[in-house]
Amino acid sequence: MARKPVELDFESTLAQLEAVVTELERGDLPLESALKEFETGIKLAKQGQERLQQAEQRIQILLQKSDTAPLTDYSADE
């Protein structure tokens, strides 16, 4: 059953996206239902990405207003 994404917090968005992925991975949905689930998943992924970008912007603003160390890119090699 296709879910309608509404404005959710990040954790709820991620949980719904995981449910959509699980349902699609089962592979037993009719084509039309699978397409609706896929569309819902795309919308949820976009919503989650937007939430992450907003959080990153807030962190950057907070760091600029404080006297803490500058924000640097993460590198797994370090």
Swiss-Prot record:
The keyword Mitochondrion does not apply. The gene is xseB. Its main location: cytoplasm. It catalyses: Exonucleolytic cleavage in either 5'- to 3'- or 3'- to 5'-direction to yield nucleoside 5'-phosphates. InterPro entries: Exonuc_VII_S (IPR003761), Exonuc_VII_ssu_sf (IPR037004). One of its GO terms (cellular component) is exodeoxyribonuclease VII complex. It comes from Actinobacillus succinogenes (strain ATCC 55618 / DSM 22257 / CCUG 43843 / 130Z). Keywords: Cytoplasm, Exonuclease, Hydrolase, Nuclease. The keyword Acetylation does not apply. It holds the Pfam family Exonuc_VII_S. Heterooligomer composed of large and small subunits. Belongs to the XseB family. This is Exodeoxyribonuclease 7 small subunit. Its EC number is 3.1.11.6. GO terms for biological process: DNA catabolic process. It is found in: Cytoplasm. GO terms for molecular function: exodeoxyribonuclease VII activity. Bidirectionally degrades single-stranded DNA into large acid-insoluble oligonucleotides, which are then degraded further into small acid-soluble oligonucleotides. HAMAP family: Exonuc_7_S. SUPFAM superfamilies: XseB-like.
